[in-house]
Design a protein with these regions (language model features):
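C-terminal helix/juxtamembrane-tail motif
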Residues: 1-10, 118-142
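Cytosolic juxtamembrane helix and N-cap/initiation of the first transmembrane helix
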Residues: 1-28
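Core segments of alpha-helical transmembrane spans in multipass integral membrane proteins
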Residues: 23-29, 54-77, 93
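Hydrophobic transmembrane helix segments
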Residues: 26-52, 62
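Juxtamembrane interfacial secondary-structure elements that flank transmembrane helices
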Residues: 33-45, 70, 80-83, 110, ...
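Juxtamembrane helix-loop boundaries in multi-pass membrane proteins
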Residues: 50-64, 88, 114-118
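Hydrophobic alpha-helical membrane segments
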Residues: 65, 86-102
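Membrane-helix boundary connector in multi-pass membrane proteins
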Residues: 77-81, 96-114
Length: 142
């Protein structure tokens, strides 16, 4: 039996995409916790109209983010499962739609420290997953 190593917690599938999914999942869990603890960081994301951020909207956003984290975490370890892969891709589509619409249509978000990270994660995740779909779905199940 191979010695247990701390890095064995990382997804075994080749490439960086599964590790990226694990990373954004962990970051999203941390973001979800802060959404329940304080409005400070949620108001940074929605800096265009911070007065619209309240406890309920922050907790709802935290719950939505936690659900996306769960899907992305599962996909990190099941990257060759087509249904899981597609649902995970959908989380990036929804996140991108949300953040871009809050910025460009509703005006509740402005480009800055609160919005830049989520926009980068959503667009990077989406384009990476779309471009690598055939490769990862051709892998044997882990």
């Amino acid at each position: 039996m191979e010695d247990a190593k701390w890095w064995n917690v990382f997804p075994l599938s080749p490439g960086l995409l599964p590790k990226f999914l694990l990373f954004v999942s962990v970051v999203s869990v941390a973001n979800s916790m802060q959404c329940y603890a304080t409005l400070k960081f949620t108001k940074r994301v929605y800096s265009g109209k911070p007065f619209e951020v309240n406890g309920l909207s922050s907790r709802t956003f935290g719950t939505w983010t936690l659900l996306a984290a769960l899907v992305r975490f599962y996909a990190a370890y099941n990257i060759s499962n087509g249904a899981v892969y597609d649902i995970c891709t959908g989380t990036f589509i929804l996140a991108g739609w949300h953040f871009f619409s809050e910025w460009l249509y509703f005006g509740t978000a402005h480009i800055g420290e609160g919005l830049t990270g989520p926009l980068i994660a959503a667009t990077t995740g989406f384009f990476w997953m779309v471009s690598q779909r055939d490769y990862y779905l051709a892998l044997p199940a882990q």
